[in-house]
């Protein structure tokens, strides 16, 4: 079996599910069941919520390997030297350090891990230029450093520390948690949903990245012109709750191996794609070799 994708978010946080798939209702359920047969069926949860938030920020607009290097460097410099006592692995407050200063909100500090190993406190007080240098492998380091310092400051001010934030994410009402995350500047729907899935272990959450957005519309599981949120709503209402998590990670892997943006396997014929009998091939024209975004194909039909 191939290594699971999105190492920067969920690679080792899943536990294997039973080999018998749940009965699928409709085509979306059949697609996800087949993805489970191709790759893996796992339950997710158990990641530290704030660290998961950090991982998702680092993963934006970069490759997994690059964001993983940035994450490792950040944790080496700012993370706790020992696991938290909890044993977990892995009204809006004003934005801390919301100026162009290269320091955190509390000025200059010595060891960034002085505050009892709390990652949120360490990043809230981090020098922004030092943090940017540390996470440079992820790219857009200045922007991401500013986002991380701001998020850390808000977590510390609103929840006191990373552990309290983790408790909120893992025990709070999922809808309220998602709403609170989306109120944080720099956090979009995919990031919020990844935190709910990989940290909160919430069933029924299907984060939508570029792969999922493309594949769901190409197969015909969502309207061709649907935006990310509409795709998410379609998947979360047509895929069984317990299958949404591995459906997300397995669909990403399927997008990398078979259903790529420009050269999907179906161009070589239906036998080249394990999803051929379930796919509408919206925007894919094997007879000419043309591949367009599903929304463009829809516009062309008008």
Locations of regions flagged by a protein language model:
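Catalytic cores of DNA base-excision repair glycosylases
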Residues: 20-300
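Secretory targeting signatures
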Residues: 1-13
């Amino acid at each position: 079996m191939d290594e699971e994708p999105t190492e920067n978010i969920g690679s080792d946080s899943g536990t294997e599910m039973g080999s018998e798939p749940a009965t699928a209702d409709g085509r979306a359920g059949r697609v996800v069941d087949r993805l489970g047969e191709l790759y893996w069926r796992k339950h997710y949860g158990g990641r530290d919520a704030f660290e998961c938030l950090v991982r998702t920020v680092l993963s934006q607009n970069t490759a997994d390997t690059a964001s993983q290097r940035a994450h490792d460097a950040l944790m080496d410099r700012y993370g706790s030297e020992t696991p938290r006592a909890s044993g977990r692995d892995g009204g809006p407050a004003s934005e801390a350090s919301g100026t162009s200063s290269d320091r955190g909100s509390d000025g200059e500090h010595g060891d960034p891990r002085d505050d009892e190993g709390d990652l949120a406190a360490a990043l809230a007080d981090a020098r922004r230029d030092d943090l940017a240098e540390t996470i440079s492998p992820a790219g857009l380091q200045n922007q991401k450093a500013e986002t991380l310092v701001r998020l850390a400051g808000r977590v510390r001010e609103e929840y006191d520390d990373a552990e309290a934030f983790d408790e909120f994410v893992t025990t709070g009402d999922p809808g309220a948690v998602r709403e609170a995350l989306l109120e944080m500047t720099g956090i979009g729907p995919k990031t919020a949903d990844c935190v709910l899935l990989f940290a909160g272990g919430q069933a029924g959450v299907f984060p939508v990245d570029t792969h999922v957005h493309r594949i769901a519309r190409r197969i015909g599981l969502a309207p061709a012109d649907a935006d990310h949120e509409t795709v998410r709503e379609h998947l979360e209402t047509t895929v069984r709750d317990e299958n949404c998590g591995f459906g997300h990670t397995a669909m990403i892997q399927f997008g990398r191996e078979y259903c790529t943006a420009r050269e999907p396997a179906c161009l070589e014929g239906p036998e080249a794609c394990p999803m051929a009998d379930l796919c509408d091939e919206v925007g894919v024209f094997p007879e000419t070799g043309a591949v367009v975004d599903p929304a463009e194909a829809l516009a062309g039909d008008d």
